[in-house]
């Protein structure tokens, strides 16, 4: 019950928002990581409406990820972070800040970066 778990991709197969919401309710220490997340964004790179609602309501439970699991993926890191900045901009500023860095800092016991 005290274990903290980071759920890679918040479901790599594109788990429906309802499923993600149910698992967050069932497991209070579950954190959703948001790299390679089908359905997260709309066609223009902004957040889909259902994910915007979920991330706004549960911003303390998600964190940005990059999915740089092999060295070759680091070549596209800047682009990945630019994509994340694009959809983070669709959230209220406090929620975006939590997802972008505060939740990760808290999870790993690091000081919260100054704004």
What are these regions (language model features)?
Residues 9, 32, 67, 96, ...:
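Conserved, mostly hydrophobic/aromatic
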Residues 1-64, 114:
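Catalytic pocket-lining loop regions of alpha/beta-barrel enzymes
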């Amino acid at each position: 019950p005290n274990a903290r778990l980071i759920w890679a991709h918040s479901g790599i197969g594109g788990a429906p928002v309802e499923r993600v919401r149910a698992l967050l309710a069932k497991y209070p220490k579950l954190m959703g990581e948001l790299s390679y997340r089908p359905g997260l964004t709309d066609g223009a790179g902004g957040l889909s409406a259902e994910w915007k609602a979920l991330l706004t309501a549960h911003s303390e439970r998600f964190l940005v990820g990059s999915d740089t699991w092999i060295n070759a993926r680091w070549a596209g890191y800047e682009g990945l972070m630019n994509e994340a900045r694009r959809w983070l901009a669709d959230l209220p500023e406090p929620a975006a800040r939590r997802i972008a860095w505060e939740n990760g800092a808290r999870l790993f016991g690091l000081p919260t970066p100054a704004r």
